[in-house]
Amino acid sequence: MRVGFFISSLSGGGAEKVLITIAQSMADNNIGSVSITSLEKRPQFYQVDEEKVELYKIKNKHTGIRAFWEDFISIRKHIKNDNAEVMISFLSRCNLLLLLCCLFNNRKIIVCDRNNPLKEHSRVIFWLSCLLYKRANRIVVQTNQIKTFYPRFLQKKIVVIENPIDNHKLQNELCRDGYNTKRVISMGRLEPQKDFETLIKAFAEINKQFSDWKLDIYGTGEKQEIIQKLIDDLNLTSTVCLCGRTEKPVMEMSKSDIFVLSSYYEGFPNVLCEAMYAGCACISTDCVSGPRELIEQKLNGTLVPIGDVSKMKQALLTYIKNEDIRQKNGKNAQRTVERLYVNNIMKKWRELIEQVGENK
């Protein structure tokens, strides 16, 4: 079977990483021939073994409506020349483009929404998207909570598959020479969704009592200057660092004691999964969706209300003051995410692709 993947870019991001993991795993295990088509809207960050996976890059320079039209023409031309039996699209824009291109044919399509659709779009756009999603053979979402957001007429098409952890690859990044590094770590795009401001303000309070602890934030984005100014204004330049991107996030996590996810919303937070895999004591906002399906309160991590500096500070203090709790929660977290190991998740993807390919 030939399977074609579609995505807007292969830049740094959770959806891009998941697509690469699934496509590469299929190719490595000889599950048919695999291709990836990227619209190249941002520079490529994630790499793929091009000896096993065919990589196509569609480069259109325009923005807005013109870009959408040009991408539509390019994708339509591409799929006419490609004989993929099943096409799998990631992220809303690419999903809509692929469905529009195949509106009047019988190509088999799986679309994957990777975020909270009610936060990502206006309600009008969401409902228009849902009408177009009727054309898809299957819709993949990451959590049961996200599934409930979609209308009843789509429910039979929706399949919940959590994100995989590529444990075979990531085990080489683990670097646990010892605990008590006195390092807090966070990762994500420096954009409003991630709300790093709440974390930094909470850490500013921590710093007054535990000045030997450090906070490292990995990622880039539109709010970098604003976040750096907040760090400067709070006199945290010696203890809080914006570190840019890292190609080995799990290595950095495994050299840290505490991981924090401060987001307003998520689809299914890869970075939280990876931090749990690395054995960090994890703190996350109780946002929609994902954290609540991963964290059991105070057993393998801590959930705090969104945007609550005081509760974030309290959660940090609990871990900072109690190394035994940090280690216990970190080890429990590692056991929790074993269900996400790539072989376990790939079984679900293989079954889904075979069902769609056979028209079940």
Say what each PLM segment does.
Residues 5-66, 149-151:
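N-terminal strand-loop element at the rim of the active site
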Residues 13-21, 182, 189-208, 215, ...:
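A conserved mid-protein helix/loop that constitutes part of the nucleotide-sugar donor-binding site
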Residues 37, 281-285:
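Short hydrophobic beta-strand element within catalytic cores of glycosyltransferases
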Residues 89-97, 113:
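Short His-centered aromatic/hydrophobic patch
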Residues 145, 164:
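Carbohydrate-associated surface elements
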Residues 212, 228, 311, 318, ...:
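A short, well-ordered alpha-helix in the C-terminal region of glycosyltransferases
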Residues 245, 264:
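Aromatic "clamp/platform" in nucleotide-sugar-dependent glycosyltransferases that forms part
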Residues 296-309, 318-324:
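Conserved acidic donor-binding segment of nucleotide-sugar-dependent glycosyltransferases
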